[in-house]
Amino acid sequence: MSIQMATSYDLEWINNQYDSIGFVRSDLKRDKVAIITYNNEYAGVGRLVQIDEDTLEMGGIYILPQYRGIQLAGELVSFLVETAKKLQVQHVYCLPIEELEYFYKKYGYTEVDTTKEIVHPIVLKNIIGV
């Protein structure tokens, strides 16, 4: 298993995966995309999206079906969390579906109370669908 940051060479494969599951396509000028490989094969993808200079959103985590159940998603999230720390941004948000809240809490994410904390307007829009 290995994880590396994507290059323009990888972008077609990345966006084919995102298209297949209805996710927004990646743009390497805006997104920091990581690819996880297993036995030298592409196994999954995830990204950090720049919201503004102080804010990233982690998301787009997708592991191909044949590679699920071997903790690759956790490895990918850990890699992205470490990447975000190296970038020294102030806020990193993740907007998981309810079933994945526990999974992300294992990696240090906490639930944001939008009535008590200031949240970037784009993130707030995604949270409450404004």
How should each PLM-predicted stretch be described?
Residues Y42-G46, E57, L80, I118-H120, ...:
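Membrane-topology and secretion signals of cell-surface/extracellular proteins
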Residues A84-I97:
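Conserved GNAT acetyl-CoA-binding A-motif
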Residues Y9-W13, E53, E98-Y102:
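Short alpha-helical
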